[in-house]
Amino acid sequence: MPGVSARRLSHEERRQLAVNLTRVVTLYRSILDAYIIEFFTDNLWGTLPCSWQEALDGLNPPQLATLLLGMPREGEVARYRSVWPLTLLALKSTAYALAFTRTPGFQTPSEFLENPSQSSRLTAPFRKHVRPKKQHEIRRLGELVKKLSDLTGCTQVVDVGSGQGHLSRFMSLGLGLMVKSIEGDQRLVERAQRLDQELLQTLEKEEKRNPKVVQTGPRHPPHHVVRWVDPTTLCEELLLPLETSPQSRARLLLTGLHACGDLSVALLKHFCCCPEVVALASVGCCYMKLSDPGGYPLSQWVAGLPGYELPYRLREGACHALEEYAERLQKAGPSLRTHCYRAALETVIRCAQPELRRPGVQGIPRVHELKIEEYVQRGLQRVGLDPHLPLNVAALRAHQAQENRVVAFFSLALLLAPLVETLILLDRLLYLQEQGFHAELLPIFSPELSPRNLVLVATKGPLGEAFSLLETEDN
């Protein structure tokens, strides 16, 4: 999907982008704020302009992927069956033009061509116990952190919200960085320490089997700390150096791989207020968990704009997987009917118990193999209602016949979702610049593998042309 590069924008252009984003989000708030499971109960299709309904009605999933989301299959040419209204074309063009580009600036052969489960860019010891998505993420972010550390003269990397320690382990034992790993869950830390020891033993065995491999110095596994990082207070542990040197002060680089909600905000605030922290590389996620207020907006500029507010539903939608859904649309698989079935179930729930709105429904296996009435019966049971309630099967079948409309409305919301994510991340960029620091956003992961793929990079001093090194991929 095309978009705008944050790197190519001046400070004033970034501020103007925030103005444009708040205007557009306000204009299409009714779509962004809608819950797809209320498609029938709230007549969401009827909220669209009639001309939009005519243009979108009857489009099959692959056509939606190509014409609306702008993601045709390779070699496919977009062919419109009718002239779309200018307002719908404007929505599409605006969504493309104002969202940060999610395509990395480098193009390399897929690391999973030979084996979909094993990255060809990571050695076997670092792939063990690591899912393909995470293999891709730790390699890309780890290599960027290594370059950023070298450019800024950092003496220590602090990985916040480190989980099982996969990123910390790669940075320390794979890239030779001094790493402190901070995680609030004791069980995850204990598992990380076990994996550290397992990897160390594997590397030692490899050295014995292959004497030509020369280890240049002692290996330093990550130093693990069990600690919750409170976004509202300074975490002293985060700032303590691993090694004290009387000659120089510690220079810290903070990083977080998909630091959840306010944890990403905590990294920004520690970077801003602590002189020991000279660099930051943060990939955020779970925007709906941001404190309101406190987590957004951070910048004075965005806070002063009319329409800046992003309620829970909009922030939840910003955690989109646009590329993955477009691929599902192109395949037109039966799993696409899940939203339609769930929306039909909501109509039955409201009739049976009107005060019960949007209850969570535990996963119903193999939905696409069920008749809609069978799905509704299982869904009723999962929300604590009588599964043998009399059902209007004709009404349910009429809902099922609108499956493509449900998919079309969801696709519209998904088209707009990157604008909300862009506004959240742009607010963080502007916040850092308001504090007098240098900040950029880079697409670092393949969006098909990792939807939250934009890394916020910040430094206390300018990097100049050297910053371009962070956009390249190691051979």
From Swiss-Prot:
GO CC terms in record: membrane
UniProt entry keywords in alphabetical sequence: Coiled coil, Membrane, Transmembrane, Transmembrane helix
Top-level division of the source organism's lineage: Eukaryota
Keyword presence, Metal-binding: no
An annotated Gene Ontology molecular function: rRNA (adenine-N6,N6-)-dimethyltransferase activity
Coiled-coil regions listed in the entry: 186-210
Membrane topology of this protein: Single-pass membrane protein
Transmembrane segments: 406-426
Tagged with keyword Transmembrane helix: yes
Signal sequence annotation: none
Record's subcellular location: Membrane
SUPFAM superfamilies given in the database record: S-adenosyl-L-methionine-dependent methyltransferases (SSF53335)
InterPro entries xrefs: Methyltranfer_dom, METTL25, rRNA_Ade_Mease_Trfase_CS, SAM-dependent_MTases_sf
One protein family per Pfam: Methyltransf_32
Family indicated by similarity: Belongs to the METTL25 family.
Protein's name according to its UniProt entry: Methyltransferase-like protein 25B
Gene name linked to the record: METTL25B
